[in-house]
Amino acid sequence: MINKEEISKIADYYFQVKRLANGIKSSTKERAEKFSKDLLAIFLLAGAKSFKSISKLSDIQKEIVMELTKKFREDIYNDIYQYVLESNKLSLELNDDLGWEYISMTDNGIKEYMERTYGGETTKQRINTNTNRFRAVVEVYLANTLLSIKTNNIEKITDEVQKKIWNNISSPYNVSFIPPSKQKHYGRGYATNGISQLYVIEQQMILGIFNEANYNSWKNIPNFKGWRTAVTSKNPCQFCIDEQYRIHTDRPKLPFHAHCLCILYPVFNT
């Protein structure tokens, strides 16, 4: 059963994370900072609506949880949707600045392209679908992580969550990276058109949750053991392959990988 202190802790983390969050690096830094601060609030807030013992809470405790959940859905979900929607424009700006080949989102041809490629969904419908999928992955990851301290099989939970994250990243996007150009962005892969670039940005949003998080706050959770690298790419780099079975008591810093989508996740003693 969740006691009053635990509910209060969720609320404290919510505001704590919003205060401490650092803005992600972006050409639209102001918007990215606002988005990252709200997005990081998901870390504990997403779990608030998913606690199995919520029915056992007192009326006051339920009211607190529901209030947090309502704010989470109304404020943060809206920010997620708007960011994904606006990333259309960001995608075109990036492509235009770097001289990449792209298809304009405003061209009539884009509708035919979307219908041919995505079964009749318009650009907005596609973005909405991806946003919903993104929300689901975040909720599943965090709800399970919070609940995992009460289970005896941490590995099984995290493995299942990693599968969901990988499925979200890999399908049905099928983003094809090509070797980076030294004249444009040395050391980074890039997509071949504006639509693919949009999905790359969405992938970066997912990874940003983990890369920009206040990981130190997890050390205060009971039974915390350390950090482990989760390989979420079909073709991970050798660094992540070597690191995936190691547990670090201090958070290791993952380098930026052009073709490797890997994250860190907390491990708890069973």
Could you describe each region identified by the protein language model?
Residues 178, 182, 186-270:
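Acidic, glycine-rich two-metal-ion catalytic cores of nucleic acid-processing enzymes
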Residues 1-192, 205, 270:
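N-terminal leader/targeting and assembly helices and adjacent pre-domain segments
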